[in-house]
């Protein structure tokens, strides 16, 4: 299991709180590197000050990590990673799963739902309707 390192951001008020579920089932961690200390908004409500250098924040849900990643992009911080941590301590990188963000080109990434034709070459939907095929398979 990968060990995560970094400083926890400074909380000025409410942290938004971790759910008890995070200790019993699973929790999520997001790590990022900041060029300077700056205030950011937490996805659970409230605000915190990120430390200069490596930061580590534990969250109760993956969606909070994705939302915080969007906040970090406003600060031109794009090296964030989101991990799932199981109660046994097992750590798994979940975003970006293959090391490259989804909107970037990755030579090894397989195309998903790719159909090699232009939109004008699509078959007539009425010809497919009762044929048993799906429109995305035709």
From Swiss-Prot:
Family: Belongs to the PsaD family.
Alphabetized Gene3D superfamilies for the sequence: Photosystem I PsaD, reaction center subunit II (3.30.1470.10)
Keywords, alphabetical: Photosynthesis, Photosystem I
InterPro entries, alphabetized: PsaD, PsaD_sf
UniProt key word Membrane: no
GO cellular component entries: photosystem I reaction center
Annotated TM spans: none
Record GO biological process: photosynthesis
Annotated gene: psaD
Cited function: PsaD can form complexes with ferredoxin and ferredoxin-oxidoreductase in photosystem I (PS I) reaction center.
Organism: Microchaete diplosiphon
Keyword Nucleotide-binding: no
Entry protein name: Photosystem I reaction center subunit II
PANTHER family: PHOTOSYSTEM I REACTION CENTER SUBUNIT II, CHLOROPLASTIC, PHOTOSYSTEM I REACTION CENTER SUBUNIT II-1, CHLOROPLASTIC-RELATED
